[in-house]
Swiss-Prot record:
One GO BP annotation of this record: L-tryptophan biosynthetic process
Binding site for Mg(2+): E320, E457
Subunit structure, interactors included: Heterotetramer consisting of two non-identical subunits: a beta subunit (TrpG) and a large alpha subunit (TrpE).
Role summary: Part of a heterotetrameric complex that catalyzes the two-step biosynthesis of anthranilate, an intermediate in the biosynthesis of L-tryptophan. In the first step, the glutamine-binding beta subunit (TrpG) of anthranilate synthase (AS) provides the glutamine amidotransferase activity which generates ammonia as a substrate that, along with chorismate, is used in the second step, catalyzed by the large alpha subunit of AS (TrpE) to produce anthranilate. In the absence of TrpG, TrpE can synthesize anthranilate directly from chorismate and high concentrations of ammonia.
Keyword line: Amino-acid biosynthesis, Aromatic amino acid biosynthesis, Lyase, Magnesium, Metal-binding, Tryptophan biosynthesis
A GO molecular function held by the record: anthranilate synthase activity
Name this polypeptide is given: Anthranilate synthase component 1
Annotated residues for binding of chorismate: G293, T294, Y408, R428, G442, A443, G444
């Protein structure tokens, strides 16, 4: 692999428009902590791997993408299958020449569905069971060799390819983006019309689920559980990239993504790390960064500070956050060397365009015999999307939610060739299939939750996303 650095004088989205289409991706950072929101990457896939119903399928678009075809078949866990794919491609690729790049050097880009938990957590005895109506893959990842990386801190674009011909192709894409040439625009007509919207749970059903969850809390089974419902929107002829552009405008975040798998698209803007690995001082670190506690931004600097104080003095928000930090420490502790787990940021405020969050940072040094795939398994799913204790909370989710979650509450991001991994929690995300858009919204249920208020919380979240679509139809 070779690398060419050029001045950053064009934005990632403009460059992505040059290649948009099936089997392309954009992972973009806009706001947040600089060490998190530093890189944006985009490219065309060499192939993709799909894990579903215990089986791995490999689709290749190039000769390189075909290298893992022999790995197709049954596996006990999608993470095991992804590891085998990663290791197979390492036989054919040399990343030693691009070591100066701190993060992504190529690898697997895609998503893990929440429902992969079923491969290592036994939920078979839970009744009633949610239905798997949409039948999304358990995991779906692009195979990425040649790509473009934007370093927002250094203000440079890294062109990374296997050979000079690949570099020239990436240069051509950048050049066309700079001069505004775009023969690749997808123009779809839109009409000003009422959206067709439906929820997989009625208000009465959701409120009953909250009441049942509170019974489990008072019985001592759990401290908290996150219950969610799914909203379906008919997208008609809407250009899906316009949805990403609007989400990017309204809710810029450290983790924004547009993954075009053809039949399926994953479009979102998540503020929260699920888990990531890093190297520092010859140590392999595993990191998670729980977010719990949110309040709006102030209209003035003075009001902003007052709202920050209000959030940090809210005993309910603080108690929930501390509980989730303890859960994160426990998860990270399973895979870290003894005595290395620490909370490096505790209950700090991070400010975004419209909201401010309470955030903590939990770090550990990864055990010698653990890789990024085992790190995901130990921390998946995020406590902020399941509850605590985590396994019992997931059992209650299984009982009370109507359908499988699919990508919602899982992870989206990458596994690098070099075992660096970075996954965001899949929230604030549109999942598109067969021209239907699905958005899942949840509420954290605790002992003093008021069922009506929890429904209203999901309604606020859901309608914010519906308005995003409505604004594109005017």
């Amino acid at each position: 692999m070779i690398i060419k650095k050029i001045k950053m004088d064009v934005c990632p989205l403009d460059v992505y428009e040059q290649i948009r289409g099936e089997n392309t991706f954009l992972l973009e950072s806009a706001e947040g902590v600089p060490k998190v929101a530093r890189y944006s990457i985009l490219g065309k896939a060499e192939g993709k791997v799909i894990f579903k119903n215990g089986k791995l399928k490999v689709e290749s678009f190039t000769e390189f993408g075909d290298k893992a075809k022999d790995l197709e078949g049954k596996y006990e866990c999608p993470l095991d299958a992804l590891r085998e794919v990663r290791n197979e491609y390492l036989k054919y690729i040399d990343i030693s020449n691009i070591e100066p790049i701190p993060r992504f050097k190529g690898g697997l880009v895609g998503y893990l569905s929440y429902d992969i938990i079923r491969y290592w957590i036994d939920l078979s005895n839970i009744n009633p069971k949610p239905i798997n109506d949409l039948k999304f893959p358990d995991a779906e990842f692009f195979i990425v060799k040649d790509f473009i990386s934007f370093d927002l801190k250094e203000k440079v674009i890294n062109l990374i390819a296997e050979d000079d011909e690949g570099i020239r192709e990436l240069e051509r894409i950048i050049k066309n983006a700079k001069i505004g040439n775009n023969d690749n625009k997808e123009e779809k007509t839109t009409e000003n019309k009422d959206l067709k919207i439906k929820s997989n749970m009625s208000k009465e059903e959701f409120i009953e689920a909250v009441k049942k969850a509170k019974e489990y809390i008072f019985a001592g089974d759990i401290f908290q559980v996150v219950l969610s419902r799914r909203i379906e929107i008919d997208l008609d002829n809407l250009d899906h990239l316009k949805i990403y552009k609007k989400v990017r405008e309204i809710n810029p975040s450290p983790y924004m993504y547009y993954l075009d798998f053809g039949d399926r698209k994953i479009i979102g803007s998540s503020p929260e790390i699920l888990v990531r690995t890093d190297y520092k001082d010859n140590k392999r670190l595993v990191i998670t960064r729980p977010i719990a506690g949110t309040i709006r931004r102030g209209k003035t600097e003075e009001e902003d500070k007052e709202l920050e104080k209000k959030l940090l003095s809210d005993e309910k928000e603080r108690a929930e956050h501390v509980m989730l930090v303890d859960l994160a420490r426990n998860d990270i502790g399973k895979i870290s060397k003894f005595g290395t787990v620490e909370v490096t940021d505790f209950m700090i405020i991070e400010k975004y365009s419209h909201v401010q969050h309470i955030v903590s940072n939990v770090v550990g040094e990864l055990k010698d015999n653990y890789d990024s795939f085992l790190a995901v398994k130990a921390t998946f799913p995020a406590g902020t999307l399941s509850g605590a204790p985590k396994v019992r909370a997931m059992e209650i989710i299984e009982e009370l939610e109507k359908t499988w979650r699919g990508p919602y509450g899982g992870g989206v991001g990458y596994f690098g060739w070099d075992d660096l991994m970075d996954l965001a929690i899949t929230i604030r995300t549109f999942v598109i299939s067969k021209n239907k858009g699905y958005i899942q919204v949840g509420a954290g249920i605790v002992a003093d939750s008021i069922p009506e208020n929890e429904w209203e919380e999901t309604e606020r979240k859901g309608m914010a996303n519906v308005k995003t679509i409505e604004s594109l139809l005017k």
